[in-house]
Amino acid sequence: MGYVKNRIKELSRESGGKTSARKTAERWFEDTVKNRRLTEASYTRTRFEPGKIYVFEYNPITENLPWFDRNPVVLALEQVDSNDLGINLNLLPVELKEQLLDDLYNRLENQIDSASSGKKALSAKSQKPLRITYDGMKAYLKRFGFDFAIRQYVPSRKIDQAVISYNRWPEIVLCDFIDLNGVTVQQIRAMFSNR
């Protein structure tokens, strides 16, 4: 068990359970993005940078799209043509989401330390991107049947995008921001279970 899982356990213990920890984490996020002096979660208009986690409102305005998440929490991968690519963490089961970020944090700990050293330590916008790839993340998620969580986003359709600092991954993983349009998460998982 690495940093992310240990911190989630600690937050749950401090809050008197995981449900209370989730509520505390959601309050932390809302309070932090509203306060411009706090930089661990900050609004940004930049394109995705690999390895960073973004939370934003989304409206793809595509008439033929059967479903979408209005409020994705995305681990950024790379840019594809004019779109941003990333893993919508909302589509993953809680245990897999925690395991993915725990594994990634442990594997990239030296990069994370370097990317967030000095004044960048608590500044999500200033932290350097990480070296993670589409192929690596696709292979990881495919083992569990959740590679469908890799999604593309049109940058101009994102609103109120916030970036989260690496040290706050445990808090953002606790948050439940999913807001699906057209389906439930169970229906999405059923759609992709036959692949």
Task: Identify the meaning behind each predicted range.
Residues 1, 15-16, 50, 85, ...:
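Feature targets compositionally biased, intrinsically disordered low-complexity regions
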Residues 93-195:
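Intrinsically disordered, low-complexity, charged/polar segments
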Residues 2-53:
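Mixed-charge, Lys/Arg-rich low-complexity intrinsically disordered regions
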Residues 55-58:
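A generic structural signal for residues embedded in beta-strands
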Residues 63-81:
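Short beta-strand-centered aromatic/proline hotspots
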